[in-house]
């Protein structure tokens, strides 16, 4: 077993405490990440301590803006190597998780992690956000949708809010200051049925990396015309014309 003192200290700074089995699951996850990263592009961060800080603890920092409840349904949009969805599932075993990504080879990796960690009530799905949001099985079905994908908040809101049930939350993870980006996203939130509740800015434990969690509540149903097809949410985000 590796020296997890940095991880344990970081968890405590988040008000969390994991048992031995959960810590072992994170170690296996790391080993699989490095193994698969040798033949496919999953992460540029490979040192154990750095993965702990910039992937594991960053993923778990969700608790700074949202208190996970037993039986919550969570969608991780554009999950990539499984962040933040898999760390959240390890820490909260009762969480129901769907990981979605547009690259099928990543889904193979995610399924391997799910199987090796013997995680239940979690699945990985290959698909594009614009297409899957049209399906009744997914539209407005989740208590919380999260994303660490690098895109403007207005774009992410159009891709993610259609999946959030009324009264639920969409929470994107962002780097640094987001004031201008949030001002830009105001019109998109109006169109999509979202309302900004708060933004929480903090530094990751033992780093000077500034992160912001944007807590957007779903206050009304998203019109059926969203998300727009053909890559429009990313190419032409919903921004108020001046």
Swiss-Prot record:
Q: Where in the cell is it found?
A: Cytoplasm
Keywords in alphabetical order, please. Answer: Cytoplasm, Methyltransferase, rRNA processing, S-adenosyl-L-methionine, Transferase
- Judging by the UniProt lineage, the source's domain of life is Bacteria
Q: Where does S-adenosyl-L-methionine bind?
A: 78, 83, 129-130, 148
The catalytic activity of this protein is classed by the Enzyme Commission as 2.1.1.-
The entry lists its GO molecular-function terms as: rRNA (guanine-N7-)-methyltransferase activity
Query: Could you name the Gene Ontology cellular component terms for this entry?
Result: cytosol
Which InterPro entries does the UniProt entry name for this protein?
rRNA_ssu_MeTfrase_G, SAM-dependent_MTases_sf
Q: Does the keyword Hydrolase apply?
A: no
Q: Which NCBIfam families would you find in this protein's record?
A: rsmG_gidB
Task: Write down the HAMAP family for this protein, in alphabetical order.
Answer: 16SrRNA_methyltr_G
- What family does this belong to? Belongs to the methyltransferase superfamily. RNA methyltransferase RsmG family.
Q: What does this protein do?
A: Specifically methylates the N7 position of a guanine in 16S rRNA.
Under what name is this protein listed? Ribosomal RNA small subunit methyltransferase G
């Amino acid at each position: 077993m590796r020296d997890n003192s940095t991880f344990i200290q970081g968890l405590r700074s988040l008000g969390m405490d994991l048992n031995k089995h959960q810590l072992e699951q994170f170690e296996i996850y790391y080993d699989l990440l490095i193994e698969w990263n040798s033949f496919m592009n999953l992460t540029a961060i490979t040192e154990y301590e750095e993965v702990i800080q910039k992937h594991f603890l960053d993923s778990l920092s969700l608790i700074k803006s949202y208190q996970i409840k037993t039986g919550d349904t969570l969608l991780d949009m554009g999950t990539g190597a499984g962040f933040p969805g898999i760390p959240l599932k390890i820490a909260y075993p009762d969480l129901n998780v769907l990981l979605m990504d547009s690259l099928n080879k990543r889904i193979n990796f995610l399924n391997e992690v799910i199987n090796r960690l013997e995680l239940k009530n979690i699945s990985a799905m290959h698909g594009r956000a614009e297409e899957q949001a049209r399906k009744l099985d997914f539209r407005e079905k989740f208590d919380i949708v999260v994303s660490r994908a690098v895109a403007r908040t207005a774009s992410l809101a159009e891709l993610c809010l259609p999946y959030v049930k009324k009264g639920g939350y969409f929470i994107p993870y962002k780097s640094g200051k987001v004031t201008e980006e949030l001002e830009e996203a105001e019109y998109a939130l109006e169109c999509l049925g979202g309302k900004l509740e708060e933004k929480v800015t903090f530094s990751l434990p033992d780093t000077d990396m500034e992160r912001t969690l944007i807590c957007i509540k779903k206050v009304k149903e998203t019109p059926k015309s969203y998300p727009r097809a053909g890559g429009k949410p990313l190419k032409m985000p919903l921004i108020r014309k001046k």
